[in-house]
Amino acid sequence: MNMEIMLDFNDLNISTYELCRILGILLDNAIEAAKMCEEKIINIQVRRDFKIDRKLIIIENTYKNKSLNIDKIFEKGYSTKKNNEELHGLGLWNIRRILHKNSNLNLFTTKKDKLFSQQLEIY
């Protein structure tokens, strides 16, 4: 795991609880996905973008399910996990609810050949 933090957390315009909830879900998902891969990679960047005055938290991980539909992962009940499905499919949906309550937050999800990426922007 690689981690880089270059940000003062005192000026974030989000409650500590909501930020921890988002990060906990994203990190749990990244760890679960990377565990399933032969090459287990998790990259975390925390930094400030001074050009447009935003904070960025980027979490990237290797993933196995290349057919993953990133348009559906935020739907309530959608899960890539096959066991105990009633316990899964709520994490990213909860993030979506937090994003809707906070107009200063954006989350961009992308996938490439090797890495799945979640970029949280805080304005």
Per-range role (PLM):
Residues 3-22:
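Conserved short strand/loop->alpha-helix "switch" segment adjacent to the catalytic nucleotide/phosphoryl-transfer site
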Residues 16-40, 97:
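Conserved ATP-binding N-box helix of the HATPase_c
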Residues 41-53:
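Short beta-strand/loop element within the Bergerat-fold HATPase_c
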Residues 53-86:
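Glycine-rich/acidic phosphate-handling loop/turn and adjacent ATP-lid/helix
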Residues 61, 119-123:
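C-terminal beta-strand of the catalytic ATP-binding
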Residues 84-98:
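Glycine-rich phosphate-binding loop
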Residues 102-112:
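Glycine-rich ATP-binding loops of the HATPase_c
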Residues 111-119:
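Glycine-rich nucleotide-binding loop
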